């Protein structure tokens, strides 16, 4: 039985992963085993940080919204306002509320008055 060396197939596979790792430093861009390991690590880090970015933005929106609610002097906190918002069945998420608070403070004041007027 003759020996098959897989030259072109293996080279194509390594070239493909080497192209991905061409921006890495040192042996992480030259050695195949290191390239594979660093590629896996890069994908894991990117997935983790995408999830972390979602959490960070949510924290930012909550902080901004809390500051805006306390600044307009409606008289209650962020948590109470969100609770009353859900009870009055207004469908506004934190991102939209924060944009309203930044761009048009009067509109946020009117929304909070509507929540208080609805008697929840």
Swiss-Prot record:
A GO cellular component entry from the record: ribonucleoprotein complex
Any one GO biological process: translation
Protein family: Belongs to the bacterial ribosomal protein bL20 family.
Annotated compartments: Plastid
Gene: rpl20
A Pfam family that the UniProt record links to this protein: Ribosomal_L20
Functional description taken from the UniProt entry: Binds directly to 23S ribosomal RNA and is necessary for the in vitro assembly process of the 50S ribosomal subunit. It is not involved in the protein synthesizing functions of that subunit.
The protein's name in its UniProt record: Large ribosomal subunit protein bL20c
GO molecular function (one): rRNA binding
Keywords from the named record: Plastid, Ribonucleoprotein, Ribosomal protein, RNA-binding, rRNA-binding
InterPro entries according to UniProt: Ribosomal_bL20, RIBOSOMAL_L20_CS, Ribosomal_protein_bL20_C
SUPFAM superfamilies: Ribosomal protein L20 (SSF74731)
NCBIfam families with a match to the protein in the record: rplT_bact (TIGR01032)
Top-rank lineage group of the source organism: Eukaryota
